[in-house]
């Protein structure tokens, strides 16, 4: 099966939290099981540095890093990689399924839109980012109304990390 993983940051950018580690571990395991795994991510390493390797293969996973507009924004969970969106539009139809890590991101909107356009099933894994109870509540509510509710509605599956997260859906 050809699987595309979409995540804002990927190893060695471990400072960006759980989605980095989970997407990496899931990708490694899928590759070990014989699946063709590709990861689309940004070039963010941390708030000051970028990973200057646009394409690489690690542990059976093809990793493509797209330039994000600002590492400072990425450090605030606002990574934006326009070239990734353009590439998704062109090639998402080559995949059997898309696994999207994170919920409120530019990459998520693009991946969901193009997967839906080409009738490619997508799995959405918010990694605990669904609740609006923490900072930026107003912005999160706007995102949810404009994009988020549709992203959830059209997902083939949604992965929750806890019983509490299940209740948020």
Task: Name the predicted role of every residue range.
Residues 97-131:
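An aromatic- and histidine-rich active-site surface loop
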Residues 6, 40-42, 66, 125, ...:
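Generic beta-sheet signal
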Residues 153-169:
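A short, active-site helix/loop in glycosyltransferases that binds the activated sugar's phosphate group
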Residues 1-52, 59-62, 93, 153:
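N-terminal subdomain of nucleotide-sugar transferases
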Residues 121-123, 131-154:
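Nucleotide-sugar donor phosphate/pyrophosphate-binding loop at the beta->alpha transition
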Residues 96-97, 157:
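Structural motif
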């Amino acid at each position: 099966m050809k699987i595309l993983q979409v995540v804002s940051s990927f190893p060695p950018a471990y400072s960006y939290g759980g989605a980095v580690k989970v997407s990496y571990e899931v990708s490694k395991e899928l590759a070990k099981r014989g699946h063709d795994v590709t990861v689309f991510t940004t070039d963010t390493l941390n708030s000051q540095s970028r990973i200057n390797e646009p394409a690489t293969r690690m542990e059976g996973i093809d990793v493509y890093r797209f330039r994000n507009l600002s590492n400072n924004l990425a450090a605030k969970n606002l990574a934006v990689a326009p070239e990734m969106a353009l590439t998704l539009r062109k090639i998402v139809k080559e995949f059997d399924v898309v696994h999207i890590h994170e919920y409120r991101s530019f990459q998520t909107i693009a991946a969901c839109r193009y997967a839906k356009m080409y009738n490619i099933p997508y799995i959405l894994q918010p990694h605990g980012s669904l609740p609006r109870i923490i900072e930026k509540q107003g912005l999160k509510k706007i995102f949810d109304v404009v994009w988020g509710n549709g992203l959830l509605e059209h997902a083939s599956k949604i992965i929750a990390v806890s019983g509490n997260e299940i209740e948020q859906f």
